Amino acid sequence: MPQNVVLPGPAPWGFRLSGGIDFNQPLVITRITPGSKAAAANLCPGDVILAIDGFGTESMTHADAQDRIKAASYQLCLKIDRAETRLWSPQVSEDGKAHPFKINLEAEPQEFKPIGTAHNRRAQPFVAAANIDDKRQVVSASYNSPIGLYSTSNIQDALHGQLRGLIPGSLQNEPTASVPPQSDVYRMLHDNRDDPAAPRQSGSFRVLQDLVNDGPDDRPAGTRSVRAPVTKVHGGAGSAQRMPLCDKCGSGIVGAVVKARDKYRHPECFVCADCNLNLKQKGYFFVEGELYCETHARARTRPPEGYDTVTLYPKA
């Protein structure tokens, strides 16, 4: 809807323009400075400027519009077009009544059944007859097992047998089945039973015993020296002994190794003996068997008076 807005002068007006005929877009206010004259006149970003001081903006370029605004010294009259504001409203049916959701807060009673009475029930054609609907039954009649293995009667018998082992004196009250000695079964079992064999002696102990017994009778057996068998070292042990040892820490080196004068070191142990400076990619010096950097090597090898130290690097 077009409306007229008057801004009292002088400049600045407090808004920014965009568009123009050179951009093939209408002149639109894109920014309002808070607290400015444009903000006091209720100008908003997005307002389309139709006229400036009575001159239409249909044929104005962006530069022409800026010149018209700069030419206004006492007041600035703008004719703007502002889009209508639409408020959201809920969708209503044709009869004018909305259909709310139906919510039932009333609790629905459920049938109570003890655990095990009807859970995971499945037809079992080869199961022994059992009262499945009995509410006192907790364990199912079969779990993919032989017929009646986990039935109620077998479980009770197993539990009773465990309790008999825990209660003292219960074995005395149990009746013992008596087998007549003159029966054929009793005689067959006892005839086929072998006599207990003598304990066997190990081969190594037998060899030691023969060595002890071969000596003279007057010499005590405890004084004879017996050598233990020597275990042969496998080929893998020799390869382990060939592992290089670090000249500084003394431990074996696995992986990267640094060699200097036929001595091996870990990369982290290849340091100066005084300042612990890592000598990798640097010059190193051996002084009295120790490894030093150039600075501390010079300090330890001071020449006599009248002589100067000259560092000689090996040729590549």
UniProtKB/Swiss-Prot annotation:
Keywords: Cytoplasm, LIM domain, Metal-binding, Methylation, Phosphoprotein, Zinc. The modification Phosphoserine is found at S18, S93. One of its GO terms (molecular function) is cytoskeletal protein binding. InterPro entries: PDLI1-4/Zasp-like_mid, PDZ, PDZ-LIM_domain, PDZ_sf, Zasp-like_motif, Znf_LIM. Residues 244-303 form the LIM zinc-binding domain. The keyword Oxidoreductase does not apply. SUPFAM superfamilies: Glucocorticoid receptor-like (DNA-binding domain), PDZ domain-like. SMART domains: LIM, PDZ, ZM. Its main location: cytoplasm. The keyword Aminoacyl-tRNA synthetase does not apply. It is found in: Cytoplasm, Myofibril, Sarcomere, Z line. Pfam families: DUF4749, LIM, PDZ. PANTHER family: PDZ AND LIM DOMAIN PROTEIN 3, PDZ AND LIM DOMAIN PROTEIN ZASP. Interacts with ACTN2. Forms a heterodimer with PDLIM4 (via LIM domain). This is PDZ and LIM domain protein 3. It comes from Mus musculus.
